[in-house]
Amino acid sequence: MKIEAVIFDWAGTTVDYGCFAPLEVFMEIFHKRGVGITAEEARKPMGLLKIDHVRALTEMPRIANEWNRIFGQLPTETDIQEMYEEFEEILFAILPRYASPIHGVKEVIASLRERGIKIGSTTGYTREMMDIVAKEAALQGYKPDFLVTPDDVPAGRPYPWMCYKNAMELGVYPMNHMIKIGDTVSDMKEGRNAGMWTVGVILGSSELGLSEEEVENMDPAELREKIEVVRNRFVENGAHFTIETMQELESVMERIEKQELIIS
């Protein structure tokens, strides 16, 4: 079996180490309403279409109960829409600062292209958001062959439609000749639902939630423990393989191709 295409996520996988761009904004829009949410809570739905992310936060029992205590009712669709509009406004202003390719990504992409492998991408960002991120990333040397946003398909993750559209545009079939790689639980579900080899990348991921500086300065034993927690989370949610850095991706591809593995 030959791998013909790799479909990458964006924030936390190929750009924005640690996926920090949306994190503070999610926390801020709730804080402004007197409802404090933690970074861990804010990260949990990461990878979803952003309005679905806001909705998922309002459905978390602790957050819903706190909202009900303050406002005397649960969050409404109007509340969700208002928060999402605020989220967009703030995020658009900061996105250009969070579009730098993660270390090693450009080199891996170049190596894949030398092997004739096509490069696709999916995201939880809207097309308007990605117009900003993709433009800035391209200026810094990262540009996949194709990009699909949730706006382009009936629904975003965990549905497989963005992966299917990549497959059609890249001209690759069957789906088990493709790899989906990402940094969130929703990425793992998206890849699995699409019938693709699914890989979770740990360092730089939203699931790990650490900056490069934090990774560098953390006690090695503590860091190893956190890495293993994320690894297990990926596997529990469908990952066929996990890698700590993007540089390990090609060895995963070789395992698939040489051992003639079958997706289960």
UniProtKB/Swiss-Prot annotation:
GO cellular component, one term: cytosol
GO BP term, example: organic phosphonate catabolic process
Keywords assigned by UniProt, alphabetized: Hydrolase, Magnesium, Metal-binding, Schiff base
Reactions performed catalytically: phosphonoacetaldehyde + H2O = acetaldehyde + phosphate + H(+)
Ligand binding (Mg(2+)): 9, 11, 183
Co-factor binding comment: Binds 1 Mg(2+) ion per subunit.
Entry EC number(s): 3.11.1.1
Required co-factors: Mg(2+)
Pfam families: Hydrolase
GO molecular-function terms, A-Z: magnesium ion binding; phosphoglycolate phosphatase activity; phosphonoacetaldehyde hydrolase activity
Keyword Disulfide bond: no
Catalytic residues (positions): 9, 50
Family matches, as InterPro entries: HAD-like_hydrolase_sf, HAD-like_sf, HAD-SF_hydro_IA, HAD_sf, PGP-like_dom2, Phosphonoacetald_hydro
HAMAP family recorded: PhnX
Function (record text): Involved in phosphonate degradation.
Self-association and partners: Homodimer.
NCBIfam families: HAD-SF-IA-v1, HAD-SF-IA-v3, phosphonatase
Family of this protein: Belongs to the HAD-like hydrolase superfamily. PhnX family.
Name of the protein in question: Phosphonoacetaldehyde hydrolase
